[in-house]
Amino acid sequence: TMSKMIDWSDRSTCVLFGDGAGAAVVSAEETGVLELVQKSNGAGKGVLSCKARETRNLLNHESETKEYLYMEGQPVFKFAVKTVPKCVEEVLKKAEVKKEEIRYYILHQANSRIIQSVAKRLKEPEEKFPMNLSLYGNTSAASIPILLDEMNRNGMLNRGDKLVLSGFGAGLTWGAVLLEW
């Protein structure tokens, strides 16, 4: 969970994250994953990563090393708003699917401004970009499965809907998948 990796003394980062878990059950069907794009660039490893820090246990005075999430917010924001739309466009182009065919874009719930910026860059209405960030914060890799489950339970997804799921994370890594529900 994210709370175990958060540096609670870093006020610019700790307030953004929440704990959550997500999973998906997949099976062989006629529909499903239509296309996938997955990329990484290690040159950005320093702006979003885990860093080790030695701490001292106050009870027994022994030192221990603990890894904490480290994030430089501005570079991550700029990376996401530039890279996610390109990745979405690439997955659609590879699949020969038009934006008008997409019911929803389900993005990693990192930051509402990132999601709004991606919608604007793709020239798509924000209604096609559901968000639950205000409920849970950034739950890291769990954010897309949690949102997908909520949408399914709320009757927002119908058989045959085309969805684009897209996320980014440490390293820096990013990707998108086009699927038919």
Region spans (language model):
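Acidic, glycine-rich active-site loops and adjacent beta-strand->loop/helix elements
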Residues: 1-4, 29, 39-41, 135-137, ...
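Acidic-glycine-rich active-site phosphate/pyrophosphate-binding loop
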Residues: 1-2, 55-62, 114-126
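Short secondary-structure boundary micro-motifs
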Residues: 7-9, 80, 90, 120, ...
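Condensing-enzyme catalytic core mediating Claisen C-C bond formation in acyl metabolism
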Residues: 8-78, 82, 86, 168, ...
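Claisen-condensing/thiolase-fold acyl-transfer catalytic domains that form or cleave C-C bonds
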Residues: 85, 103-181
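Stable alpha-helical structural segments in soluble proteins, enriched in small hydrophobic residues
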Residues: 87-95, 147
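Short, surface-exposed connector motifs at secondary-structure boundaries
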Residues: 96-101
